[in-house]
């Protein structure tokens, strides 16, 4: 424990906050082949693997996920929200931050209705979150 004099001389260092979605904090310069510090709200990527995984206890389901290689060459696991999807390997997807509490290691969501990802069919409520168009009357 520091003395009062030590605290007067040095002071306390505040801890820097850690990002919950670190892959969105980097860009990539393909000419120089270096990472850049350009952060982005979403990033484009290519699905390298699409599958299902089981959640932590006490939940039980088959949650859909995709392994995505981003445009900054970082590979992340992203959750596919909604019922049913059309993603395959090599689909181009848009990811955003946001973890899935019962899937360890999944810190990103795929944006439905953007790029190759179709919106959820027949969805009437919370349509904007799932890329569903307004139904015709």
Swiss-Prot record:
Query: Which keywords label this protein?
Result: Methylation, Ribonucleoprotein, Ribosomal protein, RNA-binding, rRNA-binding, tRNA-binding
Q: Which residues carry this modification: 3-methylthioaspartic acid?
A: 102
MF term (GO), any = structural constituent of ribosome
Entry annotated with the keyword Ribonucleoprotein: yes
Q: Where is the composition biased (Polar residues)?
A: 32-41
Show the CDD domains listed in the entry.
Ribosomal_S12
Spans annotated as Disordered: 1-57
Task: Provide the GO biological process annotations.
Answer: translation
List, alphabetically, the GO terms of the cellular component aspect.
small ribosomal subunit
- For the keyword Transferase, the answer is no
Role summary: With S4 and S5 plays an important role in translational accuracy. Interacts with and stabilizes bases of the 16S rRNA that are involved in tRNA selection in the A site and with the mRNA backbone. Located at the interface of the 30S and 50S subunits, it traverses the body of the 30S subunit contacting proteins on the other side and probably holding the rRNA structure together. The combined cluster of proteins S8, S12 and S17 appears to hold together the shoulder and platform of the 30S subunit.
Q: Which family does it belong to?
A: Belongs to the universal ribosomal protein uS12 family.
Q: How does it assemble?
A: Part of the 30S ribosomal subunit. Contacts proteins S8 and S17. May interact with IF1 in the 30S initiation complex.
HAMAP family according to UniProt: Ribosomal_uS12_B
NCBIfam families given in the database record: rpsL_bact
**Protein name, per record:** Small ribosomal subunit protein uS12
* Species whose genome carries this gene: Ligilactobacillus salivarius (strain UCC118)
Source taxonomy lineage? Bacteria, Bacillati, Bacillota, Bacilli, Lactobacillales
What would be the name of the gene that encodes this protein? Answer: rpsL
């Amino acid at each position: 424990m520091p003395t009062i004099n030590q605290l007067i001389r040095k002071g306390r260092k505040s801890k820097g906050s850690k990002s919950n979605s670190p892959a969105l904090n980097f860009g990539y310069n393909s000419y120089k082949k270096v990472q850049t510090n350009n952060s982005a709200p979403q990033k484009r990527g290519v699905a390298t693997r699409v599958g299902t995984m089981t959640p932590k206890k006490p939940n039980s389901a088959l949650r859909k996920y995709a392994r995505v290689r981003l445009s900054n060459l970082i590979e992340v696991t992203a959750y596919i929200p909604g019922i049913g999807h059309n993603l395959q390997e090599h689909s181009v997807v848009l990811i955003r931050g946001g973890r899935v509490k019962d899937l360890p290691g999944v810190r990103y969501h795929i944006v439905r209705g953007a790029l190759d990802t179709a919106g959820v069919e027949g969805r009437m409520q919370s349509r904007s979150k799932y890329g569903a168009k307004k139904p015709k009357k």
